[in-house]
A protein has these predicted regions:
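RNase H-like, Mg2+-dependent phosphodiesterase core
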Residues: 1-183
Length: 183
């Protein structure tokens, strides 16, 4: 993995991630869970925030992976919430995987976490590109005036409801798009 240059995905370009992750996934077992923007918007609410959604998805893949792979020593999760908060998010889940070591900045401390981060980013990039192809538009990532302009084009071409399928509506971009459209 080190030969491939595995490190924190935030320290790598998207191009490099797209190049090396196919090699990584040939060598290690993994599971993924994709939450579409539409599903995210339906589930996100006053009592369900992004960290709760992440906890639910992390737990889902950990349960699947550890059920399939019996020969493992420990599980590390890049800490995005305090452990008691993480497990509180899962209180209504049927199966909860609990044998977790939480590490802040886990990608810097664990090769396995760095690989998981890269695989997640790879899947995100592939899904993001598919979304752009479906819309017949080049989509931009992040938050900027240019991203807002693309959002406006989506609304003009497909209507505002389409935005809920391609964007997280609780982000500030949505308010800016609504404001610009209403002028």
């Amino acid at each position: 993995m080190e030969e491939l240059g595995v490190k924190d995905s935030k320290k790598m370009t998207d191009e490099k991630i797209l190049q090396i992750v196919p090699e990584i996934i040939k060598k290690i077992p993994y599971k993924s869970a994709i939450l579409s923007n539409k599903e995210y918007n339906e589930r996100y609410s006053a009592d369900t925030n992004m960290n709760k959604l992440k906890a639910i998805l992390h737990n889902k893949v950990l349960v699947q992976l550890t059920n399939e792979i019996k020969n493992w020593d420990y599980v590390i999760v890049d800490q995005f919430a305090q452990p008691f908060v993480y497990f509180n998010y899962l209180k209504s889940s049927n199966a909860v995987f609990k044998r977790i070591t939480f590490l802040t900045k886990g990608e810097d401390k664990s090769l396995a976490v760095a690989c998981a981060s890269l695989i997640s980013r790879f899947i995100f990039l592939k899904e993001f590109n598919k979304l752009g192809e479906q819309l017949d538009m080049f989509l931009l990532k992040g938050a900027s005036d240019k991203v807002d302009e693309v959002g406006i084009k989506i609304v003009e071409k497909y209507g505002f409801n389409k935005l809920s399928e391609v964007a997280k509506l609780n982000f500030k971009n949505t308010d800016k798009i609504k404001e610009k459209i209403s002028k």
